[in-house]
Amino acid sequence: MSEKIYEYKDENNWFIGKMTGHNLISGWGVKHRTIKKIDDLLDGIAATLDWENPKGYDVSVVRYQSPLSLITFIIDMINQETQREIKVIPHAGTILLMENAKLLAVYLPEGGVSTATFFATSEQGFGDTILIATRNEGKTKEFRNLFGQLGYRVENLNDYPELPEVAETGTTFEENARLKAETISHLTGKMVLADDSGLKVDALGDLPGVWSARFSGPDATDAKNNAKLLHELAMVFDQKKRSAQFHTTLVVAAPNKDSLVVEAEWPGYIATQPKGENGFGYDPVFIVGETGRHAAELEADQKNQLSHRGQAVRKLMEVFPAWQAKQS
């Protein structure tokens, strides 16, 4: 049996675990009935056919907000230790455990969910479809990587060429994200995720902000925007005074539901010249925190763990099941 210590930590959850011969969840902030529900859910999944060397999980909870994060953490431990491929899939307010197209178990929120909501599934199978309110394939790729890990199918507006462009007339990130999500949800009848993201540079009074995509004018491109940003900061030589944050506001809208809003930021600095071949937008000129690395030097999985968008999606996943169940 592995002696590896596993750990997951974010703003709202902190778990430490190892594999033992029995199942145990202990710690702070988790109700006893929640622990029992999760233990019942996972009973038998952690076991193997090797009865002489049974595998169980021993998890200490330091900080807790969501069963989705805790279940995902435990399943990741089990997968790594047993070479299984169990997927954790949020679906209609529930959490499904699936492997090789087989449904193994279902976690229900307090109060359950309606059968109409649960079985309102397309022929493609279990898992929710998210329509991303963008035609930007770079942004869609990031969301697809993030949501794909959680079992979601991702579409974008390129799949719906007949839809009109939604003018981003808001003066805040939330206003713009709401405009896109709620307008497109109304037009399509679908669940829609919209984000408004941008770069806030302290020395420029939080510009380019909501105008990040068109900072260099009506014919803006990533290269033109980066060039203008570097020009605006040309006389700012101290890196500490070139501090900046990538910001994301996510809004999920669905017919006859109150919209869900989450926000996140990614701190760093603006470099004096671009570097790196990955990412898009301002990634080549954004130095990640105190690392000295540019965002465009990160591989997709690294960026998703750190970025404003990755943080926002993880926050969204924490509150999404309860929102979905409450609104159904």
UniProtKB/Swiss-Prot annotation:
- The entry marks the following residues as binding Mg(2+), namely 196
Class of enzymatic activity (EC top level): hydrolase
Gene Ontology biological process terms in this record? nucleotide metabolic process; purine nucleoside triphosphate catabolic process
Q: How is the cofactor bound?
A: Binds 1 Mg(2+) ion per subunit.
Gene Ontology terms, cellular component aspect?
A: cytosol
One Pfam family name from the record? Ham1p_like
Give the record's keywords alphabetically.
Answer: Hydrolase, Magnesium, Metal-binding, Nucleotide metabolism, Nucleotide-binding
Record flagged with keyword Transport = no
Q: Where is this region: NTP pyrophosphatase?
A: 130-324
Chain positions recorded as substrate binding sites = 134-139, 197, 280-283, 303, 308-309
The record's region (Unknown) falls at 1-129
Q: Which cofactor does it need?
A: Mg(2+)
Return the EC number. 3.6.1.66
Q: Does the keyword Electron transport apply?
A: no
Q: Which domain of life is it from?
A: Bacteria
Q: Which residues form the active site?
A: 196
Family membership: Belongs to the HAM1 NTPase family.
What this protein is reported to do is described as: Pyrophosphatase that catalyzes the hydrolysis of nucleoside triphosphates to their monophosphate derivatives, with a high preference for the non-canonical purine nucleotides XTP (xanthosine triphosphate), dITP (deoxyinosine triphosphate) and ITP. Seems to function as a house-cleaning enzyme that removes non-canonical purine nucleotides from the nucleotide pool, thus preventing their incorporation into DNA/RNA and avoiding chromosomal lesions.
Task: Report the protein name in the record.
Answer: dITP/XTP pyrophosphatase
Per the UniProt entry, what species is this protein from, by scientific name? Streptococcus pyogenes serotype M6 (strain ATCC BAA-946 / MGAS10394)
